[in-house]
Amino acid sequence: MDANIGAMAKHLASHHKGFRPHAKTHKCPTIAKAQMAAGAVGICTAKVSEAAVMLNAGISSVLVTSPVSTRQKAQAVNAIASNEAELLLVVDSVVGLDALEAEIDANKTVGVVLDLDVVMGRTGLREDDVFLRLLDRIHEDPRFYFAGVQHYAGHIMHIPEFEKRREKSLRSWDRLATKFQLLEQRGVRADIVTGGGTGTYDIDVGIEHLTDLQVGSYIFMDEEYRQVGGADSDRFKGFDLALTVACTAISQPQPSAITVDGGYKAFASDSVNPVCDGLPELQFRFAGDEHGVLLRPQAADNPGDNQGLGVMLGDVLEFAVPHCDPTVNLHDQYWVREEDGMVHGYWPISARGCSW
């Protein structure tokens, strides 16, 4: 993990881009502090509740990357906002700014980042008139300052061919040109232009306007990302696997299958299946909430065909997770293995379940 943090920080610094890693991946203040120590300009969180955990732990700058749109959420923002740390909020609607105006105390100041969407269709505004209206209102209210803009094209991150991924990412940034022209016409500077991610970390550094990248999964990697091709290979090789889930072999219901005690409650199942690097010839199949089954590929359709799986009952196996972010949210803590290969302690996943 430390090597991944260092590699990303060095890469971004070499291209004169800021390092604003996303804590929705790890949900752990200890890891966030390590990222800040490596030169991060701040930490991203997906939700206000995650931001509360990070600010309470002493993180000095937090950007909430999902839009605020209700007064209840704005009240939560007001509760954590202070002049002792920088709190940046994403807004993409008049409704969201209305909520913040109604709830933020007069003696507090928060930065507003306008979320822009040109291709993904998840969050972000597209209309120029709404963009300008929000910009004007931000400048009129002393509790707010215009911090910049955000553009995240998450649907591009896992495009499997590097050149296709590169083409679509660059095109998505090109479509923001009109927004930058509007800012220039108003004489407004966007100090922050934030976005990008692990899948485009080596592409988006070439974007002139971009100030920092919101990389998240790079810190752990997962099987979904490992299957995405890199610039010069069919596997994503820029960062090492730094997160595994340990499962125990608990049963052998037939000669060609071994059951482990990790299922839907241990791994996020929205993507590919877990992979045991130590047994690459075996395939994992989910077998319910609490279990998974390892099989040889040729035994999947004919379970009686193969023996000699190389696993004994009681063996502890480590699996690369399918999708790191939601898998982390299933667990309470990280067991931390040091360079000597031994586990010397644990780190609480303090923002687990912070989904509001």
Language model segments and positions:
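Conserved, mostly hydrophobic/aromatic
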Residues: 1, 24, 54, 114, ...
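A generic structural signal for well-ordered alpha-helical segments
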Residues: 12-14, 35, 139, 183
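Active-site-proximal beta-alpha core segment in soluble small-molecule metabolic enzymes
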Residues: 22-158
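Active-site loop/helix belt of alpha/beta enzymes
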Residues: 111, 117-231
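Active-site loop ensemble at the mouth of alpha/beta enzyme cores that anchors a bound cofactor
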Residues: 167, 200-279
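C-terminal accessory subdomain/extension
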Residues: 252-356
